[in-house]
From Swiss-Prot:
Coarse class of the protein's main subcellular location: cytoplasm
Protein name per UniProt: Small ribosomal subunit protein eS1B
CC annotations in GO: cytosolic small ribosomal subunit
Natural source organism: Trypanosoma cruzi (strain CL Brener)
Classification of source organism: Eukaryota, Discoba, Euglenozoa, Kinetoplastea, Metakinetoplastina
Any one Pfam family match given in the protein's UniProt record, by short name: Ribosomal_S3Ae
Length: 261
C-alpha cells in the first residue's frame, strides 16, 4: 500500500472564516511638537497602536526621533536655513501631543561640498561643551582661509601655528558661551547664527576666514529627565483643530462599532 496523504481524513471541520480586522482601526495619530524657541510648533504627525492592556502607547512613543528642516521650523526664506536639518527626540506624551527636545542638527552634505575650495586651508574643530542645565553638546566647526585684499599669491594657506590658534580660540569661546545658558537658549544661539557670527568675528584677526560654519551639533549626554523643565521649555502648546476633530471622530466611531457587533 502506498503511503500518502488522505485528503478526506485530513480535511478539517466546517469553520467560519476569520473576520478581517482593519489595521488602521487599532491605531491613533499624534502631533509632534517642537520647543517654544521655534516658530512652527507642530511640525509633524505620527501614528502608533492604541493602548491595549499592558501595552501602553506612550511607552512606544518615548524615544522616537523626528527630523525637520530648519527653514520650515522658522519660516525663513532663502537658503540660509534650508541646508540644515534638525532632529528632535520625544521625551513625554501629553494627550495627543508629543513633547520633544533637541537631539541634533546637521548641514546637508551637498552644502558642505559646495563650501570646499582649492588653494586654501580647511580648519576643523570638534568641541564638547556642557550647558548650565547639564546637557553635553558636541559641536563640529569648519572654516576656510581666504585671500587678503592686497594679496598677489594664488593660494592662501595658513601656517600650522595659526590653525592651532584658531582652533584653540573656537574651543574656548564655545565652552564659555554655552556654560552660561540652558539647552533651549543654546539651540537659539545655534539656529539664529549668533554663536557662528561671534566665532567668525573673534577668529578673523588671527587669519582671514570665509564660510565659518557649525557643521554638526549632537547631544552626547543628557541630565536626568525633569518633567517641569520640559514643560517650561514648551510653554503653552497651541491647540490642533485636526487633533480635536480626530478625538471627536473616534468617540463617534466607538458606539457605532459596538452596535454593529
Amino acid at each position: 500500500m502506498t503511503l500518502g496523504k488522505n485528503k478526506r481524513i485530513s480535511k478539517g471541520g466546517k469553520r467560519g472564516k476569520k473576520k478581517a480586522q482593519e489595521t488602521m482601526s487599532r491605531k491613533e495619530w499624534y502631533d509632534v511638537v517642537a520647543p517654544k524657541n521655534f516658530e512652527v510648533r507642530q511640525f509633524g504627525k505620527t501614528i502608533c497602536n492604541k493602548t491595549q492592556g499592558t501595552k501602553i502607547a506612550a511607552d512606544y512613543l518615548r524615544g522616537r526621533v523626528y527630523e525637520s528642516n530648519l527653514a520650515d521650523l522658522n519660516k525663513t526664506q532663502g537658503d540660509d536655513d534650508a541646508y540644515r536639518k534638525v532632529k528632535f527626540v520625544v521625551q513625554e506624551v501629553q494627550g495627543r501631543n508629543l513633547l520633544t527636545q533637541f537631539h541634533s542638527m546637521e548641514m546637508t552634505s551637498d552644502r558642505v561640498y559646495f563650501l570646499l575650495r582649492k588653494w586654501c586651508t580647511t580648519i576643523e574643530a570638534a568641541v564638547e561643551a556642557k550647558t548650565a542645565d547639564g546637557y553635553t553638546l558636541r559641536l563640529f566647526v569648519i572654516a576656510f582661509t581666504k585671500k587678503q585684499s592686497n594679496q598677489l599669491s594664488k593660494n592662501c594657506y595658513a601656517k600650522t601655528r595659526l590653525v592651532k590658534w584658531v582652533r584653540h580660540r573656537i574651543t574656548n569661546l564655545i565652552r564659555q558661551r554655552l556654560s552660561k545658558v540652558n539647552i533651549n537658549e543654546a539651540v537659539t544661539l545655534l539656529t539664529r547664527n549668533i554663536l557662528r557670527d561671534r566665532l567668525a568675528k573673534r577668529c578673523n584677526p588671527i587669519v582671514p576666514l570665509r564660510d565659518l560654519r557649525i557643521r554638526k551639533v549632537k547631544v552626547v549626554r543628557t541630565p536626568r529627565f525633569d518633567a517641569q523643565a520640559l514643560l517650561n521649555a514648551h510653554g503653552e502648546i497651541p491647540a490642533s483643530a485636526e487633533g480635536e476633530a480626530r478625538v471627536v471622530e473616534e468617540a463617534q466611531e466607538a458606539p457605532a462599532a459596538e452596535a454593529t457587533a
